[in-house]
């Protein structure tokens, strides 16, 4: 499942806000606890727990933090593939069609695209096998 929220800054507090506003509520609505999260080693995700908003948020919510290896993007291949897909299928298409005067309008269009991506667009790969991310999640819950 892909979750996105647009921000004007790339900070630990915005990373924690994404989890608080979008990610944790979604998985809670599915009856699934968030036990672990995988991120890269960006400064918005990594720091000392007592001084870092994102690390503190994870600690308060009892979420284990796993970090990708330092250099190879293959470690987080699913995320890297999503970055390519959102660039090609959303941003490049959207910015050719429309000029945005504010972040809220762009977020609204992104939310619409994400609903399609998660619920209607079939995905290839060993985990999805032509299913949508939501179908993959629901099938996984049945196991």
Over which residues does each language-model region extend?
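C-terminal domain-tail junction helix/linker
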Residues: 61-63, 85-143
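Long, low-complexity, intrinsically disordered polar/charged segments
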Residues: 26-45
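Hydrophobic beta-strand scaffold residues
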Residues: 34, 64-65
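Active-site beta-loop-alpha junctions of metal-dependent nucleic acid enzymes
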Residues: 4-31
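Surface-exposed charge patches
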Residues: 25, 56, 60, 115
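RNase H-like two-metal-ion nuclease catalytic core shared by retroviral integrases
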Residues: 39-41, 45, 51-58, 65-89, ...
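Short small-residue beta-strand/loop micro-motif enriched in glycine and branched aliphatics
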Residues: 1-5, 66-68, 92-95
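Distinct, well-ordered alpha-helical segments
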Residues: 19, 50-51
